[in-house]
């Protein structure tokens, strides 16, 4: 049963508040209406499109990082809990894929994961010491990749960070990064 317009708009607003990264396509499937209807409803509710919502969340998080400038992060930093965990999103664009196959270049996924590891560590200097990575599935043009990083160990000079990257719920990249750091007093 379809919702009436006002009820649907309330439900759309609640769905976006619950998950600011939900796409218009996911909303149109959820509410069984056209994508144009979702866009009109969002406009009526003064809710920006997904890209703008991601940028707003990312801008709020950039002030919480110490080791890297915001413009050096590959992707948009959507969540950071310094020295614990972080998330970023990247949309795979035409300049990130091979022309013939439209499959994402591996270094894009690696760069997203690696820069997320650097951003996550709340120290002035952070460098990659070593990494072990696996590319699990193909990532294609227009896919949105969510990278989740979490610290699994800390030693005198290194953080060990695990990164899993997903397209929707499908694991596409897995990595373990050993990151070297220096403290303020060094």
Curated annotation (Swiss-Prot):
InterPro entries documented for this protein: HotDog_dom_sf, Transcription_factor_FapR, WH-like_DNA-bd_sf
Biological-process GO terms, alphabetical: fatty acid biosynthetic process; negative regulation of DNA-templated transcription; negative regulation of fatty acid biosynthetic process
MF annotations from Gene Ontology: DNA binding; DNA-binding transcription factor activity
Listed Gene3D superfamilies: Hotdog Thioesterase (3.10.129.10), Winged helix-like DNA-binding domain superfamily/Winged helix DNA-binding domain (1.10.10.10)
Keywords tagged on the record: DNA-binding, Fatty acid biosynthesis, Fatty acid metabolism, Lipid biosynthesis, Lipid metabolism, Repressor, Transcription, Transcription regulation
SUPFAM superfamilies (UniProt xref): Thioesterase/thiol ester dehydrase-isomerase
Functional description taken from the UniProt entry: Transcriptional factor involved in regulation of membrane lipid biosynthesis by repressing genes involved in fatty acid and phospholipid metabolism.
HAMAP family: Transcrip_fact_FapR
Protein family per UniProt: Belongs to the FapR family.
Protein's UniProt name: Transcription factor FapR
Natural source organism: Staphylococcus epidermidis (strain ATCC 35984 / DSM 28319 / BCRC 17069 / CCUG 31568 / BM 3577 / RP62A)
Lineage, opening ranks: Bacteria, Bacillati, Bacillota, Bacilli, Bacillales
Gene that this sequence comes from: fapR
């Amino acid at each position: 049963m379809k919702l009436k317009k006002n009820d649907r708009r309330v439900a759309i607003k609640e769905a976006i508040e619950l998950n600011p990264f939900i796409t218009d396509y996911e909303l149109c499937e959820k509410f069984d209406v056209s994508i144009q209807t979702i866009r009109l409803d969002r406009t009526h509710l003064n809710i920006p499109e997904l890209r703008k919502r991601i940028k707003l969340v990312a801008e709020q998080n950039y002030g919480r990082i110490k080791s890297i400038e915001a413009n050096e992060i590959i992707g948009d930093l959507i969540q950071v809990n310094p020295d614990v965990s972080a998330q970023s999103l990247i949309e795979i664009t035409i300049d990130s894929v091979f022309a013939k196959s439209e499959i994402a270049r591996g270094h894009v996924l690696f760069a997203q994961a690696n820069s997320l590891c650097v951003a996550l560590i709340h120290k002035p200097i952070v460098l990659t010491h070593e990494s072990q990575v696996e590319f699990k599935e193909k990532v294609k043009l227009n896919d949105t990749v969510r990278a989740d990083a979490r610290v699994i160990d800390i030693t005198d000079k290194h953080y060990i960070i695990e990164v899993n990257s997903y397209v929707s719920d499908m694991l596409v990249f897995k990595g373990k990064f050993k990151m070297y750091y220096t403290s303020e007093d060094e």
